[in-house]
C-alpha cells in the first residue's frame, strides 16, 4: 500500500515537473516563433496597402499625365493655413459613397457624370482639390476640369482612403465620423479595418476607384 502511494506520488511529481518544463519553453517559443510571425503579418499587410496605393498612382499618372497631385499631408497643412487661398474640395465619387462620409466642406461632383455646377463663377485659376477613393476617379475629374479651362486643379494622392487611414477627419454632413465607403470588397482592403464601412459593392464603369 505504501509503495503504491509512493508510486502515485512520484507520478504526480513527474507530471508536474514535465508540465512546468513545458511552461518554461512556452515563453521563449512565443517570443522566438509566434510573435515574429504576427509582426511579419502586420508589416506585410501595411506594405501591401502602401504598394497598392503606389500601383494605383503609377497607373493613374500614366493615363492622366497632365494631372497635378497633392499629398494628404500637404492638403492638411494647406487647410490650416489662414494666409493661403483655400481650395474648393470636390468629391469625385458617387452620391452613395459621399453620403457615408467625405472631407469637410467637400462638394459632390461625380466623375461618372461631371458637372460645372460646383465650380460655377469660380475664377479659372482658383485652387481646386479633387479626390476619389484611391485617386483614379479624382484624376479623371481633375483631367476633365483642366479641359474646361481650370488651371489650378490637383488630385489628392491616395484619395479619401489614404486620408482616413492616416486618421484625418471625415464627415457625414457636418458631423465627424470614422468610416469610409469601401467601394467594393476588394478595393476596401486598402482601408484599415476600423475605417472600412459595412456597405454593398458598387457597380461603376471605372477601372479603379
Report the location of each language-model feature.
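Membrane-embedded segments
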Residues: 133-138
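Rhodanese-like catalytic fold shared by cysteine-dependent sulfurtransferases
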Residues: 2-6, 11-81, 99-126, 139-209
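Short hydrophobic beta-strand that contains or immediately precedes a catalytic carboxylate
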Residues: 75, 87-93, 106
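Active-site-adjacent beta-strand anchor residues
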Residues: 91-92, 131, 156
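Structural motif
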Residues: 88, 127-129
Amino acid at each position: 500500500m505504501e509503495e503504491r502511494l509512493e508510486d502515485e506520488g512520484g507520478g504526480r511529481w513527474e507530471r508536474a515537473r514535465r508540465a512546468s518544463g513545458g511552461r518554461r519553453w512556452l515563453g521563449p517559443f512565443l517570443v522566438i516563433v509566434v510573435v515574429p510571425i504576427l509582426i511579419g503579418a502586420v508589416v506585410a499587410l501595411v506594405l501591401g496597402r502602401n504598394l497598392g496605393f503606389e500601383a494605383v498612382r503609377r497607373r493613374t499618372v500614366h493615363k492622366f499625365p497632365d494631372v497635378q497631385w497633392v499629398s494628404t499631408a500637404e492638403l492638411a497643412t494647406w487647410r490650416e493655413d489662414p494666409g493661403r487661398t483655400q481650395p474648393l474640395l470636390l468629391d469625385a465619387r458617387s452620391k452613395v459613397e459621399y453620403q457615408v462620409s467625405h472631407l469637410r466642406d467637400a462638394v459632390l461632383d461625380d466623375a461618372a457624370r461631371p458637372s460645372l455646377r460646383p465650380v460655377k463663377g469660380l475664377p479659372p485659376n482658383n485652387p481646386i482639390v479633387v479626390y476619389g477613393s484611391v485617386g483614379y476617379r479624382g484624376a479623371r475629374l481633375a483631367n476633365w476640369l483642366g479641359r474646361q479651362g481650370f488651371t489650378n486643379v490637383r488630385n489628392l494622392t491616395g484619395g479619401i482612403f489614404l486620408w482616413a487611414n492616416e486618421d484625418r477627419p471625415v464627415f457625414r454632413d457636418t458631423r465627424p465620423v470614422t468610416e469610409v465607403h469601401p467601394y467594393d470588397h476588394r478595393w476596401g482592403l486598402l482601408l484599415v479595418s476600423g475605417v472600412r464601412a459595412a456597405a454593398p459593392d458598387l457597380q461603376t464603369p471605372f477601372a479603379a476607384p
